[in-house]
């Protein structure tokens, strides 16, 4: 699959073994192929996992209340903290590509390989950031389709308003504070 091959090339360029560290969508596809199903985690995560499999594009769901300030994809300094799902604290290696916030928390390691237990979706989560990334040739048209699919499903299932955007080198920011303000307004109404 072109979508997976592009991530494997990207991981190789980062110095990672692409069959040891797989992007999230490849890991989901492998698990689904081997087991015939995926574990049920949370309705929103299950929905995003199904869409990730359908598009072969990694999708992550972050609990916005666990993110300090903005989140950015960048190289680690090595001082960031990453909370595993088992509760252990790790420190990403310097130059590793991570999702980091203003407090030095790493919310994902090895770019799209592993999400942090800190910002994982839980039953008490009220506001989320859903991120989809792709590197393959038709990513510029496939990612907006994936985002539209998620937005349509969220509106149909939960009747919620979704703010969405596509980031690029010419438009590298998505204002999380506006997304949080929208969520707060919805809770107050």
Description of each model-found segment:
Residues 1-189:
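RNA/tRNA-interacting regions in translation and RNA-turnover enzymes
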């Amino acid at each position: 699959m072109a979508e997976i091959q592009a991530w494997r090339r990207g991981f190789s360029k980062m110095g990672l073994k692409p069959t040891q560290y797989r992007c999230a969508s490849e890991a989901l596809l492998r698990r689904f192929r081997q087991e015939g199903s995926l574990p049920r985690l949370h309705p929103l995560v299950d929905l995003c996992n199904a869409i990730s499999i359908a598009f072969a594009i990694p999708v992550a769901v972050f609990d916005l209340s666990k993110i300090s300030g903005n989140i950015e994809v960048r190289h680690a300094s090595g001082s960031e903290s990453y909370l595993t799902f088992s509760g252990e604290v790790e420190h990403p290696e310097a130059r590793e590509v991570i999702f980091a916030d203003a407090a030095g928390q790493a919310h994902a390691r090895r770019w799209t390989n592993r999400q942090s237990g800190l910002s994982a979706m839980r039953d008490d989560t009220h506001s989320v950031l859903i991120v989809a990334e792709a590197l393959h040739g038709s990513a510029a048209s496939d990612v907006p389709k994936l985002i539209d699919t998620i937005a349509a499903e969220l509106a149909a299932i939960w009747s919620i308003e979704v703010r969405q955007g596509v980031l690029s080198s010419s438009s590298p920011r998505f204002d999380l504070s506006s997304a949080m303000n929208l969520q707060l307004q919805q809770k107050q109404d």
